[in-house]
Every structure is written in structure tokens, then in C-alpha cells.
Amino acid sequence: MLDQKLIRENPTSVEENLSLRGKVYNISHIHELTVKKKDIDIKISSLQSESKKLSKLIGQEISKSKNNDSPELISLKKKGNEYRIKISELEEKQRILDKEVDDEIYNLPNFPSKNAPIGKDENDNIQVKTWGNPLKDENLKSHWEIGESLNIFDSVKSTKISKSRFVTLIGNGARLERALINFMLDMHTKNGYLELMPPALVNSESLKGSGQLPKFSNESFKCSNDDLWLSPTAEVPLTAFHRNELIDPKQLPIKYVAYSPCFRREAGSYGKDTKGLIRLHQFNKVELYWFCDPTKSLEAHKKITSDAENIFKKLNLPYRIVDICTGDLGFSSSRTFDLEVWLPSSKCYREISSCSNCLDFQARRSSIRSKIDKKNIYLHTLNGSGLAIGRTMAAILENGQQTDGSVKIPDALVPYFGSNFLKNA
């Protein structure tokens, strides 16, 4: 959430910063609302101060007067009652204005970082690094073809169970999924992350705090009888884990890692990636999440990206890092590095992790602060996939495919999978 004070005092700067996203944001209405809200806040504070002074006068008058019905006391009490009525009326106006401001401000995205490349869409993203040697062979199979030949997942029967864009992992497919989850969790916990296993169902306030609501309500699955949603990413419950808290600065930085199932409608993706493991309604992911001192978030962003990179290197998967331009940034992000893995069958890199610095955007929405230099300030939050499991499996199947139809398991994963090769059972 953007700072209301900044919107109220410098609306032009706010519009200029938001315009870097490639859209026009007219905040004149919300600016007007924040000015009215501040005016009412001042009036309420002034009346409350006067009311306290009046209460003291009434107390003094009662103590020195034997007659509780004296004209002076009656006049003071009448004035006190007028104050209470006026304060109550203003507080009701304040409540209505608060809701109007929230309805507007919660739909405004984060400011893009000054270091993010200026651009309109994904075509303006900048490649900043590549690693590994991408396989380039016309005869290489897609991961869904490999999966079908090895009988490790089934999409057809999953459609019968649920609908399209679901998959059932079978035998060695389920085994490989478990191996990847445990491998990634072990890697990250050894690197100083504390593992959490959060709920898969989250309430609206949690989604609002991380930035999914209200803007992206059509992209998530909602329970019909409760204020609960299937979590689209562990970023949501990890943000909410410290909602409305004042965190001891001695605890910073807080680094969490969490495995969770993720659920997304994938609205707007009709016809894209209809086969395989790339774009599903349900998928597993290992998420990295930081809470840190605002002065340390730039370095933290480099570190969380490096921690995600480490998984690619250990699995020997060719990848690249892309600096996301201002027009392609996620709603809550100020700066994002996408980590994309090479998929030989597609002859391109595909996003498998987004490492984002959200500055104080999520912490402000979730009221997560720390007392630093004697001031209560909003912390900075960072998140990154470490990694998406299904897409990692797809990359292993394609990059590790052998001429005999088997798949070579990366050396670092062998202790978890229990075999050097994935073969048809």
C-alpha cells in the first residue's frame, strides 16, 4: 500500500512514479479523500483535547460546589455533551472516508524501482545473466511426451477427477516431486532459512495484505461458505504470519522457507501451455520470504535471488536472469528478477522463479513494523520461488532425457530420488 501522506502532500509525484508502469493513474479523487480525511482527523483531535479540558473543569466545579445543579455546572455539562455528539458525528464521517480511501488506495500498485528498466511489457525486459549450456537438438522430446512414455503423470484422468489443467503424478513422478521438495527445503534451511508449513486456506485479510486482493479476486479460488480462499502462493500466508506485529529489530532479517500447494485460476491463459506441467490450476512450490530493515533490502534482494539461483546450479539446469521492466512488474513488486530455465522442446527459457523486492508495500498493508532508531517503521519484504516444483520437474525431464528414453537424475538429487536414472517401471 502506498503512503497516504505522500498521496496527500505530493500527488503529482505519485502519478509520475505510477506512470512508469505504462498506465495512466489519475489519483485526484483519492488525493481529495485523503485531504478530507486529514482535516477530519485534525478536527477530532482538537475536539477530544477540548473535551478533556472540559472534563477537568467539570470535575473542579463539582468538587468546589455543593450544588450539582448550579448554572455553571449545567452549562459545562451541556457543552461536554455537545462535544461528544460532534466527535461521534465526525468519527462516523471518518469511518466512511477510511473505507473510501481504502477502496481506492488498495487498488494502486507499488512504485517501480528507479533501478528497474523502463519499458511497456515483457519485450522490454533485460537479460542480465546466463548460466549453463542449453541443449539444442531438433529430436528432443517435450516433457509431457517423456512423462507419458515413462507413465509418471496423467492429465486425462485428472480432467475426469477435476477439470482441465490438473495433473496426477504417478509412481516415479510422485517420487521425483517429493525428492525435489525435500531437496529444496534442505538446501534453503542449510542456508539459514527457517522452515514453515503454513495453511493452504487463507482469509481475505491475508490476501489483501500481500496484494492479491482486491485487484486479483478473479484469479483465485474462493470457498463458497467461508471467508477463505485457496492460497495462490505461500507468499500470502508468510506475509500474514506477522500481520499487525511490532517485530524486535534483533530478529531481523527474518528468513522463511515454505513448501505449499498453490491454486490459481490462470485467468487469461486460455489456449496457453495446455499440455504438461507448466501452467496448472494446482501446483507445488517452495517459497523464500524475507522481512528486513529497509536499509538492507537492496542487498537482501541480491541474496534471495542468489539463493534461488543455487538450486539451478545444484541441479545443473541452464538458466538466465531477466530484469523485469516497469511495465511488466507484478502489482506488489518494486523490482523483480525472473529466473528462467531452459526448456529444449520449446527452444526458449521459461520463468520458474520471480525474486521480488516489495519495499514497505506489503508491510504497510499488513501493519508489520519494527522499532528502529527509536521509530516504529514499516519493514521491507522480499519473496522468491525457490523453486516451482512442476516446472523444475519439466526442466529435468527435458534436459536430462537420454537416447534410450530414460532421464538422468541430477547428481545432487540422487540421494533424494534413490536412483541415477528415471526409467519406465
Swiss-Prot record:
It catalyses: tRNA(Ser) + L-serine + ATP = L-seryl-tRNA(Ser) + AMP + diphosphate + H(+); tRNA(Sec) + L-serine + ATP = L-seryl-tRNA(Sec) + AMP + diphosphate + H(+). It is an enzyme of class 6 (ligase). InterPro entries: aa-tRNA-synt_IIb, aa-tRNA-synth_II, aa-tRNA-synth_II/BPL/LPL, Ser-tRNA-ligase_type_1, Ser-tRNA-synth_1_N, SerRS_1_N_sf, SerRS_core, tRNA-bd_arm. The keyword Signal does not apply. It comes from the Bacteria. CDD domains: SerRS_core. Signal peptide: none annotated. The keyword Nuclease does not apply. Pfam families: Seryl_tRNA_N, tRNA-synt_2b. Pathway: Aminoacyl-tRNA biosynthesis; selenocysteinyl-tRNA(Sec) biosynthesis; L-seryl-tRNA(Sec) from L-serine and tRNA(Sec): step 1/1. L-serine binds at residues 233-235, 287, 385. It is found in: Cytoplasm. One of its GO terms (molecular function) is serine-tRNA ligase activity. Its EC number is 6.1.1.11. GO terms for biological process: selenocysteine biosynthetic process; seryl-tRNA aminoacylation. Keywords: Aminoacyl-tRNA synthetase, ATP-binding, Cytoplasm, Ligase, Nucleotide-binding, Protein biosynthesis. Its main location: cytoplasm. Consists of two distinct domains, a catalytic core and a N-terminal extension that is involved in tRNA binding. Homodimer. The tRNA molecule binds across the dimer. Catalyzes the attachment of serine to tRNA(Ser). Is also able to aminoacylate tRNA(Sec) with serine, to form the misacylated tRNA L-seryl-tRNA(Sec), which will be further converted into selenocysteinyl-tRNA(Sec). This is Serine--tRNA ligase. It comes from Prochlorococcus marinus (strain MIT 9215).
